[in-house]
Amino acid sequence: MSKITTVIDIGSNSMRMVVLEKSSRFAFSLINETKSRVKISEGCYENGGNLQEIPMERAYQSLKSFLNISNALKSRKVLCVATSALRDAPNSKVFLNRVKNDLGLSIKVIDGEKESYFGGVATSNLLHDDEFITIDIGGGSTEFCFVKDKKILKSISLNIGTVRIKELYFNKNNIKGAKEYILENLKKVFEQNIDIPSKAVGIGGSIRTLSKMIMDKNEYPLDAIHGFTYNVNAEKKLFENILKADTNDELQELGVKKDRFDTIKEGTFIFKTILDELDIKEVVTSGVGVREGVYLTDLLRNSNHRFPNNFNVSVKSLLDRFELNEKQSAYFGNNAKKIFEVLKPLHNLDDKFKELLVVSSKLHSVGSSLNFYKKNDNAFEFILNGLNYDFQHTSRVIVAHTIKFSKKSLPKHSDIEEYKELLPNLETMQWLSFMIA
């Protein structure tokens, strides 16, 4: 696989691009992410599904811009997929042929099941949870993927999307019809005869927007959307307030950004209906989806689209890019494990902290690559932002703080105040900092 790879996802509402750089066999990092609200499906559901000229031109110009960025980053491989709008459009070949002839880019139009599968591959590899159902709300469709023990059990796609619901129902003020349409489609989820988990992983712009609003409302300390988790019942009031809003000013007061005014009510309506009907108790927000799934199915094509056991892509990527002495890092990790076991009769910490101590020990010197004298502070920022994949928020905050106070005086209450919501008690943090010293 190429060292630098570009993946473009042409959705019904947004077009997104990620550029990813490999640092070793399975490790990689994101070097660019670009999004454009091209709304390629705009007007199509009122016109027999046919793509309209102006939206197609917007999408074409955005693709041209994306490819310029990709070329500037010296990407050697471009994977481009298109989802609901293009697979449904009778005239999709007009757009596909123009892009192929003018830009030299082959777009692969994927079916709904494949779209769902890509979301499942991304979340099962890049989130820490083992059992969940993905809910990926797009402009034209919504995908569901059942995951258990990090294995994909079933992938399905339904023609429920924000733009579709907006044009067919909301624009005609037919809210009752929208609800009936969604519930009728959701019967397919229950027909799979698979137990529906109480935990859902939310994918897509509408769901990420809702999560960001919840984070802001609750003054959540970590500015990271991927892996953010919330209790559904605790946040239903926000969903209801969005649906009650009559003007854009009211939406803005609730925390909705301007670029989401046009579909946030439809997205919230779809999401709330699904959560209620499937009796979902907890939502984990995913910052990854189809694009990362496309990349991972290529990267992991010889390993059943799964990382090896005990492999963490975030840890390996940080070590590849910033660790100055790989052997020393491995030595520190093994040493930390021994220290934890020897002192266990004194600290009585759960074994989950042993794994975090090992990770902290391996990564504690990555900050030296930027500045030796500020290495702990540098490492703190690297870890807080770099342990993005396959880590719960609590875990990455614990690792970052453990490293921050290594070879320093033990942390005090004031040192952990900002992130106390995500940290264990002070005594636990003092033990971890002591053992890494």
Role assignments for model-derived ranges:
Residues 3-29:
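N-terminal basic/disordered segments at the start of proteins
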Residues 5, 19, 43-68, 83-90, ...:
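Helical "lid/coupling" subdomains associated with nucleotide-phosphate turnover
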Residues 9-14, 135-141, 203-206, 287-289:
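A short acidic Gly-Thr/Ser loop motif
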Residues 13, 76, 281:
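Short acidic/polar active-site loop segments enriched in Thr and Asp
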Residues 28-39:
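N-terminal glycine-rich anion-binding loops that anchor highly charged ligand groups
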Residues 30, 152-154:
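Residue-level detector of beta-propeller blades
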Residues 80:
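Dinucleotide-binding Rossmann-like beta1-alpha1 core, especially the glycine-rich loop
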Residues 92-102:
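Short, electropositive alpha-helical surface patch
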